């Protein structure tokens, strides 16, 4: 089995400390990461750098490797290698020596199964108005780089231009195949999942596929009826308030709710009767006239009755 020059692979000296080697590893891992580098051998170089870091980052493995490297050209090396504790290893045990250093990576590298990369989830905020039509979005996220021990060593920024389809809902997940972390040993990349978060709207509340909006009206508008301008997600409409409308009454506007592949929801205007400020003497007199004219009306007549 070939004994690679890990120091040369990392571009460092055997006398360099761990901090220097770690800096070199991060630089090379970023340079040869398959999702960043355009070089044809980037994936192979990336794995080679990761293999070197796996050994040189561990004090015991590095010491064993250094001893092996020192005796690599010794004729006795092919027949017998002396471990630091005096134990002898024959040439047929050479693979076992590698296994003790590499955690059996060297022996099993050809036998290890292909492993799929990790999935990544990021939250994407979408405004209600944007749900009506397909739109493009530029998203940025950090792509984790895992070392040989399965720990995140660093994160590489990545940017994608994606399409957000019409009709997305809160909590919906959109899959971008292969945009997660790279697989190992020829395994496929993981996926990127966009988790949709519908941003709160200052006017509209979401109720399933429907929208609700509170429409303030005056007492006389509710009593006599009127037309008021009401906003929707697309444009404003003229809403008819029928005479005798009540506070909390819901007026349906068909087809002005949320859009999905299966259906389009409705908009419900919820009436809120707003009293004017404290009346002056003339206004109070008018209210009194109204009260006298409606003296037989008792709004609490059925109050508390089943």
UniProtKB/Swiss-Prot annotation:
CDD domains assigned to the protein according to its UniProt record, in alphabetical order: DnaJ, DnaJ_C
Statement: the UniProt record of this protein carries the keyword RNA-binding: no
Q: Which residues form the J domain?
A: 5-69
Q: What Pfam families does its record include?
A: DnaJ, DnaJ_C
| Matching InterPro entries | DNA-bd_curved-DNA, DnaJ_C, DnaJ_domain, DnaJ_domain_CS, HSP40/DnaJ_pept-bd, J_dom_sf
Q: Which GO terms describe its cellular component?
A: cytoplasm; nucleoid
UniProt keyword list: Chaperone, Cytoplasm, DNA-binding
Gene3D superfamilies associated with the record: DnaJ domain, Single helix bin, Urease metallochaperone UreE, N-terminal domain
Localization = Cytoplasm, Nucleoid
Listed PANTHER family:
DNAJ HOMOLOG 1, MITOCHONDRIAL-RELATED
Q: What is this protein called?
A: Curved DNA-binding protein
């Amino acid at each position: 089995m070939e004994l690679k020059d890990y120091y040369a692979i990392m571009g460092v000296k055997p006398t360099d400390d761990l901090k220097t080697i770690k800096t070199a590893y991060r630089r090379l891992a970023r340079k040869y990461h398959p999702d960043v580098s355009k070089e044809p051998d980037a994936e192979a170089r990336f794995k080679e750098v990761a293999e070197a870091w796996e050994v040189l980052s561990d004090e015991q493995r590095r010491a064993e490797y250094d001893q092996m490297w020192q005796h690599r050209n010794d004729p006795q090396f092919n027949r017998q290698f002396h471990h630091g504790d005096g134990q002898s290893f024959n040439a047929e045990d050479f693979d076992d020596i590698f296994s003790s250093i590499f955690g059996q990576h060297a022996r099993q590298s050809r036998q290890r199964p292909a492993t799929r990369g990790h999935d990544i989830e990021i939250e994407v905020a979408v405004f209600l108005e944007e749900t009506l039509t397909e739109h493009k979005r530029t998203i940025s996220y950090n792509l984790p780089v895992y070392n040989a021990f399965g720990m995140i060593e660093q994160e590489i920024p990545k940017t994608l231009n994606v399409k957000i389809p019409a009709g997305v809902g809160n909590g919906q997940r959109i899959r971008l195949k292969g945009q997660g972390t790279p697989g190992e040993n020829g395994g496929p990349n993981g996926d990127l999942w966009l988790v949709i978060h519908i941003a709160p709207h200052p006017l509209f509340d979401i109720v399933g596929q429907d929208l609700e909006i509170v429409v303030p009206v005056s007492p006389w508008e509710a009593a006599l009826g009127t037309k008021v301008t009401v906003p929707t997600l697309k444009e404003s409409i003229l809403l008819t308030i029928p005479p005798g409308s009540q506070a909390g009454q819901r007026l349906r506007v068909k087809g002005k709710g949320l859009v999905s592949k299966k259906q389009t929801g409705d908009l419900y205007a919820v009436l809120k009767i707003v009293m004017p400020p404290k009346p002056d003497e003339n206004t109070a007199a008018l209210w009194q006239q109204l009260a006298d004219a409606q003296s037989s009306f008792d709004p609490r007549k059925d109050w508390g009755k089943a």
